Structures are given as structure tokens and as C-alpha cells.
Amino acid sequence: MQLQKILNPFVVVGVILILSACKNDSPTPPNEAPKGAGDFSIKNGDITITGTLDLPSTPGPYPVMIFIPGSGRETREADKPAQSVLLPQGIALFRYDKRGLGQSTGAYQNVNLQNSAQLIPERASDVLAIVNFLATHQDLNPKQIFLWGTSQGAWVAPLVANQSNQVAFIICVNGGGSSVGIEIYYDGLADNASLSISQLTAMLANYTGAPGYDPAAALQALNVPALWLYGGMDRSNPTFYDIAQLEKIKQERNKDLTILLFANMNHDLIDVNTGQFDPEFFPKIIAWSKSKLGK
């Protein structure tokens, strides 16, 4: 099932930059703004979310990207390869253990049709706590905090942006435009390998089940720039259904929303013809991000 699948394009690239930056191993004293790279524990009510802040070697203050992972039991170590993409561009990275995993407290639950309307907002509340924390960090620019939501994380990112005036923009990859119910239905249909992407997309009109979490309201309310990236050969998430929903909202609500389609890319961001990662994927994201950061 798509909801049990982890998608991390930074892992696909497979390049890990080893940092020599000084780590913040000692806890921050009370009432003192956090500073430096390293591990931080962030409170969200009774829950503690633990993550790592990676900083560039150039002088700050820095913009910072919060990586919101997809589904599955993913901890921050899976997102470490993002360092090699962001840090050379002067962009800091915050990666974290999901609630109930790694060093984060609470109970971990897989998202499904029945619990998604509760768990997606719950995960957004954890990210919102991270945003609020990073806005106080001495080495970061509080006006240049942005979110990367991949797969399931693409449902989370708009919710966070709508609840904070600290989020500058969001980037979403292979997800976030359709309801949980539609995505699960599509994923199940796609088990039939004889059906084409266009046939699978057309069959979504037959879905009459429960929606589960539906992102429509969050997308309509979104008021920050957003970049969506999709693979045209994705058999886990309904790319063309998603794009149709996003285009409709863009036109009706006059949103600053950019959609990039990589025609031969699958859910794992691999070109199905070449078996390789698209070399234009990250350069296009960096260029768009820098345009929003004014760099």
C-alpha cells in the first residue's frame, strides 16, 4: 500500500555529505535562544519531537528547510542525504524523528483510511512546533523557513503553512492533492499491471467510498507559494488526478502554485525508461526556492 511506503528523493540520489560543523551537544539553558547545529528536543504538549539541525559552513543567518517524511517508520537518519543538496546552497536542514520513533516520544501509528483525519493534523501539529522553535534559533532567518513534504508529508505541509505566519513557502512531492480514500483506491487498482496510468486515473471516477483525510480545504486556504512535483508514471499516487485538483484551485483561488511534471518518473523519482534519477529534479527545485528566498 502507498501509505506504508517511504519516499525520500534525497536517498535516491545517494550522496551523503559528511559535516565537520560543531554540534550543539549541551542543552540550551532556559530562556536562552537556541544556537548552533546539532540535536534539539522540541515540546508539543506532552510529546517531545527530537531532530537534528544541519548548518552550512558559510556565515548565517540561514534559510532552513524542514523535511516532512512520507509514510513508514522513518527516522531522521533516512533524511541525512539532503545535506548534500541543501548545505552547499547555503540552506540549513532540519530533520526529525516522527512521533513515537527514534528519540521522539508518543505512540507511532500508521495512517489509514479510518484514522487519517486525526493523524494527518496531529503530524502537522508536530511540524508546527518545529517551525515555532526554529523561528527562535539565533543562526536562522525566521522569515525564511520552508517545508518539504514528500508523499504523505505533502498532506502535512499545507496544514502547517496555514497555521503559521513563519512558513515562507512549501514544496510537495508525489502527493497531497487527493484524499486518502482516493489514493488508497488508486494504489489498489494499480496492482493490476495491465492497466495504464490513464486507465487508472479514469477509474477514479468510480470511487464512492469514504474520503478519509481530504486536503481540499487546506489547499483552498493556502496563502504561501507552493511547488508541486509529480512523476507521470507513478502507480502509487494518482498524479494526474492530483494535478487536476491543484490546477482547479490555482485558477479559482489565484494561488501562487507551480506544478512540475516529470513525465517518465515513478513514485520513487526514477525514470522508468532509463532506471536513473532525473538530473533536472533538484536543480529545478533549488532554482525555484532561490527565487522565493530572493537569492
Segments from the language model and where they lie:
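N-terminal cap/lid segment of alpha/beta-hydrolase-fold proteins
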Residues: 27-58
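The serine-hydrolase catalytic nucleophile loop
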Residues: 72-84, 98, 240
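Conserved alpha/beta-hydrolase
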Residues: 86-107
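Alpha/beta-hydrolase active-site loop
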Residues: 115-138
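Primarily recognizes the serine-hydrolase "nucleophile elbow" in alpha/beta-hydrolase
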Residues: 133-187
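Short beta-strand/loop motif that positions the catalytic acidic residue
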Residues: 222, 228-230
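Conserved alpha/beta-hydrolase "acid-adjacent" motif
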Residues: 235-242
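Catalytic active-site module of serine/aspartate enzymes centered on a nucleophile-bearing elbow/loop
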Residues: 265-268, 273-295
